[in-house]
Amino acid sequence: MTTKIVNIVVAGGNYAGLNAMRHLYATLLASPVQANKTVVNITLVDRRDGFVHYIGMTRGITEPSFGSSLWVPYSTVDWLQHSQITIKQGTVADIQPTLVQLTNGEQLQFDYLVVALGISRFAPIGIRSSTKLEFVAELAESYAQLESAKSVVVVGGGAVGIELAADIKCDFPHKSVTLVHSRALPLPGPFKDELRHNVVDILQNSIGVELVLGQRVIAQEPASADMADTLTDMPEHVLSTATDATLTLSGGQTLHGDWVVRCLGTRDKKSIINLPSSTQEPIFGANGIRVKDTMQIDDVAYPHIYACGDICSRDTVKLAGVAMYGAYIAAINIARTISSVSNDSPTLEESPLYPSKILLLMSKDHFIMQLGDEIWEKEKTRQYVSDDMGLQGSINGLSLNKVPAAYSPFDLAPAF
């Protein structure tokens, strides 16, 4: 029997991409496909040389010693050194039906693709670095500006802006910290106003952050780089900070900040997804790549392409845990298809729709959570809170410190 070679590309690392890699390894490499004489090669494409625990970035800026632990180099992960795994450090420029092209011109042909490229933010919340050494240096740069500032203004009252303002004020209680948000209450999204009012109370009365709500920043002098370069494909390389800046608000008020950081939303990766739709519906919708419950792209032309994590349309609120579960579904469905010894298509797993959820970590002592329509009590929420902002849990969950156990893709995983 002729040996069949199957090439899988996972575009993007972190929570979704690495969990896809973990389950592809456990189902296809740790227990090699024997019955149909298949050799599987898996390529991970990531512009960084390691995993970054993005959830901890706000505290990584205020506590650089903690921040340096957020980056786990791929070279330290034993199972990623498998002979049938290739780690390609590079940036994806274009995704077509059978190939991924990198910005250096290299093309990677695939039989199966997992798109896990996430979404982008401007630096320093978005990560400019491609190596841990660069990451540590950039954290130190942000920390130096923060440490020398007497007054800090955070613009944008989404989850990241809220957590950053809280971490700064708690780690530097003598600094003036102001959070500016354009709406009457912070935290956009499908959440209750009761939750938003609780957030306001915690920030103002428990932590001491000054809030300016219902006003937009209409001018900033000097402007930060992101204000002039909002159309870039790589916002992570553009700083959203300014020093010694004056902000003019829509209500006529002016604010001064020795250090100003703008946390104003995300940018998608629509420009690199060049997959013609076979219907009138675009492949990339308003909330990301349209996917089925199986995590396959929702188009009959692309049963071999999966998308998971923040880049897909699956969930309104983008969460690391949901990204990991979607990646698990994608990986086992690919493994089932490859491992099937009959000509019949195997039954594919489907991902359930999860209720919206948010857990806000407002420094080490203050946190709040809404799951679906329920706002959880603090003591009930505490079980999901750790001093390291979930770092060790993510390392364990992604098997970055151990080799994943082999299992059959036709069985449920020991843990997703």
Indicate residue ranges for each PLM-predicted region.
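FAD-binding core/adjacent interface of flavoenzyme oxidoreductases
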Residues: 3-11, 35, 39, 44, ...
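Conserved N-terminal glycine/acidic-rich loop preference
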Residues: 3-6, 47-65, 113, 124-161, ...
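Rossmann-like dinucleotide-binding core of oxidoreductases
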Residues: 151-155, 159-203, 209-212, 321-349
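Beta1-alpha1 glycine-rich phosphate/pyrophosphate-binding loop at the start
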Residues: 2-86, 166-191
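A Rossmann-like FAD-binding core segment of flavoenzymes
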Residues: 41, 83-90, 94-95, 174-293, ...
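Eukaryotic N-terminal targeting leaders
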Residues: 1-7, 25-39, 80-83, 223-241, ...
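C-terminal, flexible cofactor-proximal segment of oxidoreductases
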Residues: 13, 317-322, 326-416
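FAD-site-proximal beta/loop scaffold in flavoenzymes
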Residues: 132-150, 254-325
